[in-house]
Amino acid sequence: MTEIRTPRLLLRRWLEDDLVPLSEIHADPAVMRRVGDGATRSEDQTAQDIEAWEEEWDEEGFGMFAVELLGSGELAGAVGLSVADAPAEIAGQVAISWRLGRVFWGQGYASEAAHATLEFAVQDRGLDRVVAVRRITDAASANVLDKLGMQAEGTAQDPVHGHDLAVYGIDLTQYQD
């Protein structure tokens, strides 16, 4: 089972007990306005998300980690890698993404978890490039992407939801935390 420890976090595969706390995160409009179509997700939809993330782990050898706070064991959210299917500018490439419950914002958890995920991409999966997209209006994600050393590579439009996106990439052959 893949686990990564950082000074404050445990990144791990999903457990049955994660469904309720992740559903609470997915029910928060402030969190979900930055994800996909911006709509909140039900517990059933969240269960489908976890199932899809676990399938990606089985098929690709990477996926979304559960982000757990060391000490308290509280689920803070999700971070990980996936093969992007859209927008066309990054389709087929490995993308990093995250979502954290609102109570965990502004504490550096997203940056800490994302750094550990990029290290995993290089050291455990041998990836040489990772991409990301963010909504143009999402300044908090822009800050995290900057801290990761990811470079803005242009813009795109979400083909399903119509949002304007900023596209980022990083050459992991020279990645250093």
Task: Locate the predicted segments by residue.
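Acyl-donor (CoA/ACP) binding surface of acyl/acetyltransferases
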Residues: 1-34, 64-177
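Short loop/turn motifs at secondary-structure junctions and domain boundaries
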Residues: 56-60
